[in-house]
């Protein structure tokens, strides 16, 4: 049941590729190195079933690793074989999906060999503090004829009743840098030799960011 286990990968960018019908499609490139199981949580020990997986092993000298990684984290990873990883993620799973998985097991793109679509989760690009026109698509005001109301939100209140502005209205605020999941992306190619997964369309995050890929919840 490893096809239902999530794995971490790194977004390499986007390319164009011809599909089997000869159409040119835009694809996101995800590099998936082997993910290693560093912890197994069960119903008896933690109240639910999940795996903690590690990716991108740190190959720095021991004295450098001790400076960059906390002692509790080093002690935790020592129980799983002593390998230190730059990224750790916990992925939920059912008892059936985690059956036969043990500490130190490694898996990568082979879990997607017979999969037609996947869900990809990542952190979207941060845009900083933005106004309502960029963030929410507001129309704004007139651009000329003496108007000073160009990129404002407009009225957000009422009269003396209720005498206040309701919370939750669309206002200028921070944009991006949020967890985003894109579902049901078609798998174009699984290249086990190059450790690359090609999916149709865009995925969240900047080039080089970490994404989590799992079997699509819609299939």
Curated annotation (Swiss-Prot):
BP GO annotations: translation
Top-level taxon of the source organism: Bacteria
GO CC terms: cytosolic large ribosomal subunit
Record-level Gene Ontology MF annotations: rRNA binding; structural constituent of ribosome
Keywords: Ribonucleoprotein, Ribosomal protein, RNA-binding, rRNA-binding
Gene3D superfamilies: 3.30.160.810, Translation factors
Transport in keyword set: no
Stated family: Belongs to the universal ribosomal protein uL3 family.
Stated role: One of the primary rRNA binding proteins, it binds directly near the 3'-end of the 23S rRNA, where it nucleates assembly of the 50S subunit.
Assembly and oligomerization: Part of the 50S ribosomal subunit. Forms a cluster with proteins L14 and L19.
PANTHER family: 50S RIBOSOMAL PROTEIN L3 (PTHR11229), LARGE RIBOSOMAL SUBUNIT PROTEIN UL3C (PTHR11229:SF16)
The protein, known as: Large ribosomal subunit protein uL3
Organism: Chlamydia pneumoniae
Gene name as annotated: rplC
